[in-house]
Amino acid sequence: MAIRQARDDDGPTLQLIDVATWSEDVTPAPTPQVDDEFFSGDIRSEDVLVAEAGDEVVGYVLVAPRYRGLTAGEHVQEVKALAVLPPSQGQGIGHRLVVAAVDTARNRGGRRLTLKVLGSNEVARRLYERCGFVVEGVAPGEFLLGGRYVDDVLLGLDLISV
């Protein structure tokens, strides 16, 4: 398994990963569609790292400036998305992608790396906490998903002291 920088031509594959991994248990975002463009708006290939098993992309992490274009916040990077195809889950790929995101954020001069995760997504929370992230805030009942209110949890990692 190797991790590399995404290329523009990875977009369709990354979109398929989003479709395959989407669940309201892990994201309040609308259901992604196969024909949506992955690299659009604020998502740039230089902000995405992909995990390859052989010649197949099996997961990705999107790590980008939290406040793109805002000088006062340029020291903060954010994990905006993490996804691993279901057959490849449980093999340490997510962990390796998070570690790569930490390295990328640090190499960009980041002092902090943050992310948000649903309070109900215990698997992801445990992964991030194993990587050194700590809870920095909770927005109780932030989303109504599947008929229940779910917290949005802000996690952070100090890139200077680790």
What do these predicted ranges mean?
Residues R148-V162:
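Terminal substrate-recognition subdomain of acyl/acetyltransferases
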Residues E56-G59, V123, Y149:
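Glycine-rich acetyl-CoA-binding "A-motif" of GNAT/NAT acetyltransferases
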Residues L85-P87, Q91, G119-S120:
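Active-site acidic-Proline motif in GNAT/NAT acetyltransferases
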